[in-house]
Swiss-Prot record:
This protein's record includes keyword Thylakoid: no
Protein's name according to its UniProt entry: Undecaprenyl-diphosphatase
Reaction equations catalysed: di-trans,octa-cis-undecaprenyl diphosphate + H2O = di-trans,octa-cis-undecaprenyl phosphate + phosphate + H(+)
Gene from which the chain derives: uppP
PANTHER family: UNDECAPRENYL-DIPHOSPHATASE
Misc remark: Bacitracin is thought to be involved in the inhibition of peptidoglycan synthesis by sequestering undecaprenyl diphosphate, thereby reducing the pool of lipid carrier available.
Transmembrane segments: 5-25, 41-61, 74-94, 100-120, 135-155, 180-200, 208-228, 234-254
Membrane-related topology note: Multi-pass membrane protein
Family from the record: Belongs to the UppP family.
GO terms for MF: undecaprenyl-diphosphatase activity
Keywords noted in UniProt: Antibiotic resistance, Cell inner membrane, Cell membrane, Cell shape, Cell wall biogenesis/degradation, Hydrolase, Membrane, Peptidoglycan synthesis, Transmembrane, Transmembrane helix
One GO cellular component term: plasma membrane
Length: 256
């Protein structure tokens, strides 16, 4: 029991911190599970980890989400931008392709490195477009298509959507805001698919589910708050450097 609680605490903290930073939550969860040899295969725990993050981002942007009732254009843009990841996620989940990508340290190492470099290149330019006057259907669709790459562990959903938004000349804060708003349907869709697969599982671990939702919520919420404050003042270089360090460590583990 105690080991299960420790495992859930670690996974919840990792999920909460890494979900909304451009460092890939799926990669970090895979790495932690492999290194610490966690053996929990409960899909309900996976659902609860994502549910905590989903509740956090919804709570943080609650005013913006309520304002969507009076901003039909932004609502339509978010729907358009979410269609690609919803379709791709369903296809990959239903065909079993997701199993080929999970727990593959080589894939994680290479994607962490490559997409970290791409993030650096996209963030170098001093663009200053704002969502309010420059986000259109074509742009959000392209960003949504980029988001499909996040299905590969190590790419990072936040990282690739921020990268795409920066490539379309949005400033760092608005690029991050686009990323976080697109995260809501993406995480919700992933949770629905996981919940569908979890139907029929035993619910003996309800207390672990409660712990994982609570911790994931708290760490996700404060990570979003920290990141948006940080991105107003600094570049994304620290996350690029972090990704490079992680990829080097993974390459050492793999090839030694």
């Amino acid at each position: 029991m105690f080991s299960n609680i420790i495992e859930i605490i670690i996974l919840s903290i990792v999920q909460g911190i890494s979900e909304f930073l451009p460092i890939s939550s799926s990669a970090h969860l895979n790495i932690v599970e492999i290194i610490f040899e966690f053996n929990s295969n409960s899909l309900m725990i996976d659902v609860s980890l994502h549910l905590g993050s989903l509740l956090a981002i919804v709570f943080y942007f609650r005013r913006e989400l309520l304002d969507l009732r009076n901003n039909q254009k932004l609502l339509s843009l978010l729907i358009i931008g979410s269609i690609p990841i919803v379709i791709a996620g369903y296809v990959i989940s239903s065909t079993g392709l997701v199993n080929l990508l999970e727990n593959n340290l080589k894939i994680i190492a290479w994607t962490t490195l490559i997409f970290g470099i791409i993030l650096y290149l996209a963030d170098k330019s001093k663009f200053d477009k704002k969502i309010s006057s420059n986000l259109n259907f074509k742009t959000i669709l392209y960003i949504g298509l980029f988001q499909i790459l996040a299905l590969i562990p190590g790419v990072s959903r936040a990282g690739i959507t921020i990268t795409a938004a920066r490539l379309f000349r949005f400033n760092r804060f608005d690029s991050s805001k686009i990323s976080f708003l697109l995260a809501i349907p993406a995480i919700a869709g992933a949770s629905v698919l996981q919940l569908k697969n979890a139907i029929g599982q035993s619910f003996e671990l309800n207390y672990l589910v409660l712990i994982s939702i609570t911790l994931s919520f708290l760490f996700s919420y404060f990570t979003v708050k920290f990141f948006l404050d940080y991105i107003n003042k600094f570049s994304l270089n620290v996350f690029v450097i972090y990704r490079i360090i992680i990829s080097i460590i993974l390459f050492i583990i793999i090839y030694n």
